[in-house]
Swiss-Prot record:
Belongs to the NqrDE/RnfAE family. HAMAP family: RsxA_RnfA. The gene is rnfA. Its main location: membrane. Keywords: Cell inner membrane, Cell membrane, Electron transport, Membrane, Translocase, Transmembrane, Transmembrane helix, Transport. Part of a membrane-bound complex that couples electron transfer with translocation of ions across the membrane. Disulfide bonds: none annotated. It comes from Pseudoalteromonas translucida (strain TAC 125). One of its GO terms (biological process) is electron transport chain. This is Ion-translocating oxidoreductase complex subunit A. It is a multi-pass membrane protein. The complex is composed of six subunits: RnfA, RnfB, RnfC, RnfD, RnfE and RnfG.
Length: 193
């Protein structure tokens, strides 16, 4: 049990996919201008990352390895991710039309979020078990969500702040992301892998 807790904490804080591994930067910068949209994107990405991580593990273990077609791993994982995203899109459209409209184009773009594919491929590289894959996917999603929501809250505060003209927009956003990354470096050494 301790192993899974350490894996979760390590994935969320120490090896954060956005701030440490630089995966998922497109939605991080694109959806983080409003807190409501960031929360919705976080929920959708959490669902997709966790489900895609587990599904990719199953596809790898029970289809690709037995048939000796592991060279199709990346293509297979992209297909699995696309199916999971389409399923998520249908669920969000039925349950929350407002959130569906708010997310707009970003919901289908989860398919191309490199963090989702990165989690699936890193599960294989790290030789995780089924449960470890689920925890790793969930931890990556929680870390992504945490950073996205914090960054969106900071950007809303920055929109109301008196920022010098040369730093407005993407400039101050990148500086803020860099400061967040340095803050997360403080968690280095918290969990040893």
């Amino acid at each position: 049990m301790t192993e899974y807790v350490l894996l979760l904490i390590g994935t969320v804080l120490v090896n954060n996919f956005v701030l440490v591994q630089f995966l998922g930067l497109c939605p991080f910068m694109g959806v983080s201008s409003k807190l409501d949209t960031a929360i919705g994107m976080s929920l959708a990405t959490t669902f997709v990352l966790t489900l895609a991580s587990v599904t990719s593990y199953l596809v790898n273990q029970y289809i690709l390895i037995p048939l000796d077609i592991t060279y199709l791993r990346t293509m297979s994982f992209i297909l699995v991710i696309a199916v999971v995203v389409q399923f998520t899109e249908m669920v969000v459209r039925k349950t929350s039309p407002t959130l569906y409209r708010l997310l707009g184009i970003f919901l289908p773009l989860i398919t191309t979020n490199c963090a989702v594919l990165g989690v699936a491929l890193l599960n294989i590289k790290e030789d995780h078990s089924f449960l470890q894959s689920a925890v790793y996917g969930f931890g990556a999603a929680v870390g992504f969500s945490l950073v996205l929501v914090l960054f969106a809250a900071l950007r809303e505060r920055l929109a109301a702040a008196d920022v010098p003209t040369p730093f407005k927009g993407a400039s101050i956003a990148l500086i803020t992301a860099g400061l967040m990354s340095m803050a997360f470096m403080g968690f280095t050494g918290l969990v040893k892998f």
